[in-house]
Amino acid sequence: PAADLGRVTKGAALGLLSKVYLYMKDYQKAYETSSTMMGMGYDLDPDFNHLFRPAGEFGPESVFEVNCGCSPEFGGSQYAEVQGVRNQFGWGFFTPSPALENAFEPGDIRKELTILREGETTIEGDLIKKGDPQAVDTYSQKVYVPSSLNNNACGYGSIQNLRILRFADILLINAEAANELGNTAAAIANINKVRNR
């Protein structure tokens, strides 16, 4: 129900538990727990660009996210502001590294949907201009909030929810655990679900 948005659900608890099991290298429990969670009605969002926009909050891929908003009394989240384009949408911290940019395969559309660039115009019509000649030229799409949705009373991006766990994470946890258990076919199938969305 809408009243439960932002609350920890059984799916979120199982998803986080499967991640803990994976970190503990208990691959059997990670596989079993993530498999149980995969049968709970979550799905991949077919539009990668939609995932991290405010319109994509609490979508089918959302397993757990922190609900943020603007309150005159308390302000809002600074997550997007800290990482936003310097002197335009934020402070410009935690920017994509060249290593991240080089990790994408040629032609992978996720690269352009992950990295904002100086001089780019977003699909919402915002021109990315850093305003500070010493600032970097790349920024994270994950924290971009269209200027039309900003509330100056709370700071840039104060409404942007924090995505803690997505269904794609669960598929990848399941894939890694399956691979470690020798079930390479299941691992490849789940990796390809994420890659081919």
Question: How would you describe each model-predicted region?
Answer:
Residues 7-130:
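An aromatic- and glycine-enriched ligand-binding surface/loop that stacks and positions planar moieties
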Residues 2, 7-9, 159, 166:
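Structural signature of alpha-solenoid helical repeat junctions
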Residues 25-32, 179-189:
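Structural helix-adjacent loops and short alpha-helical linkers that scaffold large soluble proteins
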